[in-house]
């Protein structure tokens, strides 16, 4: 369940900024039909930053309910306060989520020892499998391979989502981690195929929100070692990988999902604003290049 194409699911909202349950069901059904390996609910792409804790939990619980056991659900549970991250994580004990994705603390920029103690405390507070999440471009905090290796020794820390886009990190982590069952996942669609060729086991993907079948196929080709065919598919998807970040994520991907009829609105809460007209043209062209329009 922690390998292959895992979607970092967008959170559909109505015109008032409340969760659009009908669109959420439509998105989940789309991923079930497409063969997506799992859903990450309320991560960065799911707008965790603009949901309060009760709303955060509610979205995950609605996702679980609508998934109905058809697809595994991973809860995003990151915070820049350890006690807050523990509290949020514990709210998902015995709910049916298969694990938690926990981002490094953002803004306060802890030292490597602080990162170790943070994730260790979270893992020791629950039996749920934990996926570390390193995305320094957003958090201002880079969890280095030696710290990841230390954390990999903790029983229920089972994987890392590495979103630096730095492919040398794959081999650096592999050299340092003793546990061959520890899973490396790419958090960067544009370099995901190369990441898997170096030993990664999948992608936690933004692109999968709108190209679910294609990302499932890409990850399957990588798992089979068919990188020649995978590269051909990835070249077709590359404009999407890149231009879904033409403005801050998830602004472009929510617009694209609405454009493709996957959900009713591309509403976001402030400070996120609608996709600009010049960016719409760029994303539209990427959708056409990928064969989605």
Swiss-Prot record:
The active site is at residues 133, 161. GO terms for molecular function: 4-hydroxy-tetrahydrodipicolinate synthase activity. Catalyzes the condensation of (S)-aspartate-beta-semialdehyde [(S)-ASA] and pyruvate to 4-hydroxy-tetrahydrodipicolinate (HTPA). This is 4-hydroxy-tetrahydrodipicolinate synthase. The record marks 44, 107 as: Part of a proton relay during catalysis. It catalyses: L-aspartate 4-semialdehyde + pyruvate = (2S,4S)-4-hydroxy-2,3,4,5-tetrahydrodipicolinate + H2O + H(+). Belongs to the DapA family. Its EC number is 4.3.3.7. Pathway: Amino-acid biosynthesis; L-lysine biosynthesis via DAP pathway; (S)-tetrahydrodipicolinate from L-aspartate: step 3/4. Disulfide bonds: none annotated. Pyruvate binds at residues 45, 204. It is found in: Cytoplasm. The keyword Cytoplasm applies. It comes from the Bacteria. Keywords: Amino-acid biosynthesis, Cytoplasm, Diaminopimelate biosynthesis, Lyase, Lysine biosynthesis, Schiff base. The keyword Transferase does not apply. PANTHER family: 4-HYDROXY-2-OXOGLUTARATE ALDOLASE, MITOCHONDRIAL, DIHYDRODIPICOLINATE SYNTHASE. One of its GO terms (cellular component) is cytosol. Homotetramer; dimer of dimers. It holds the Pfam family DHDPS. One of its GO terms (biological process) is lysine biosynthetic process via diaminopimelate.
């Amino acid at each position: 369940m922690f390998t292959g194409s895992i979607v970092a699911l967008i959170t559909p909202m109505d015109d008032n900024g409340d969760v659009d349950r009908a669109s959420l069901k439509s998105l989940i059904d789309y991923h079930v039909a497409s063969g997506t390996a799992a859903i990450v609910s309320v991560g960065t792409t799911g707008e965790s930053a603009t949901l309060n804790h009760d709303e955060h939990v509610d979205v995950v619980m609605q996702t679980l309910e609508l998934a109905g056991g058809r697809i595994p659900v991973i809860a995003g549970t990151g915070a820049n306060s350890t006690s807050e991250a523990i509290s949020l994580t514990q709210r998902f004990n015995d709910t049916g989520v298969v694990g938690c994705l926990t981002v490094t603390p953002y803004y306060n920029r802890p030292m490597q020892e602080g990162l170790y103690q943070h994730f260790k405390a979270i893992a020791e507070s629950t039996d749920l499998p934990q996926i570390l999440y390193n995305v320094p471009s957003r958090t201002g905090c880079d969890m280095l391979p030696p710290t990841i290796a230390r954390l990999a020794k903790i029983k229920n820390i089972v994987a890392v989502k590495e979103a630096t886009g730095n492919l040398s990190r794959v081999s650096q982590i592999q050299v340092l981690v003793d546990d061959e069952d520890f899973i490396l996942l790419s958090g960067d669609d544009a370099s995901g195929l190369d990441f898997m060729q170096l030993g990664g086991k999948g992608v936690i993907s933004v692109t999968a929100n709108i190209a679910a079948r294609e990302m499932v196929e890409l990850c399957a080709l990588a798992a089979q070692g068919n990188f020649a065919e995978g590269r051909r598919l990835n070249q077709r998807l590359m404009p999407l990988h890149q231009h879904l970040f033409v403005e801050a994520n998830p602004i472009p991907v929510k617009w694209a999902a609405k454009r493709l009829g996957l959900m009713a609105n591309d509403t976001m809460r402030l400070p996120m604003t609608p996709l600009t007209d010049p960016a719409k043209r760029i994303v539209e062209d990427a959708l056409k290049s990928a064969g989605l329009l």
